[in-house]
Amino acid sequence: MSKIISVGISEHKVASDPVVLVTYGLGSCVGIALYDPEVRIGGLAHTLLPAPVREVQGAERTAKFTCWAVDLMVEELLKCGCAPERLVAKLAGGATMFEPQYRSAHGGIGERNVAAAREALERSGIPLVAEDTGGDYGRSLEFNTATGIIMVRALQQPIKQL
């Protein structure tokens, strides 16, 4: 059985050994997985918000913000031996967890997190190969870096494989 590494809210982890990266309770948050299938190295981020509301200095950049999570993981993945042209992405979460009256004119947090993730991936030239986003339910993810497979678990929903 593979070692399990938990990725908390606003965190990202990169693993160069075969492990299972897990994150729990993705509601409007987004889980972004990056993977290099040739070297079997991957990373997982659990992002909270699309972007900061004020300018933040470089040292303060964290995976709390979806707009930065991809860049932070790519930087670490390249140090571990990944090639940028081999990276692929999978995305899950971004649910609508609150009633419509609590959403802004730009959509709910979940929708904006998904949009920010897609923009960051496009900016980095990383193809999005699978996703399970939206809906009105939370998700938990298990990302096996030996296979690149993500198991998506949600209450009263069938288990999905990305």
From Swiss-Prot:
Keyword line: Chemotaxis, Hydrolase
Keyword Coiled coil: no
Top-level EC class as recorded in UniProt: hydrolase
CDD domains named among the record's database cross-references: CheD
Coiled-coil ranges per UniProt: none
EC number: 3.5.1.44
Molecular function terms, GO-annotated: protein-glutamine glutaminase activity
Recorded family membership: Belongs to the CheD family.
Matching PANTHER family: CHEMORECEPTOR GLUTAMINE DEAMIDASE CHED-RELATED
Cited function: Probably deamidates glutamine residues to glutamate on methyl-accepting chemotaxis receptors (MCPs), playing an important role in chemotaxis.
Protein name: Probable chemoreceptor glutamine deamidase CheD 2
The species this protein was found in: Geobacter metallireducens (strain ATCC 53774 / DSM 7210 / GS-15)
Taxonomic classification: Bacteria, Pseudomonadati, Thermodesulfobacteriota, Desulfuromonadia, Geobacterales
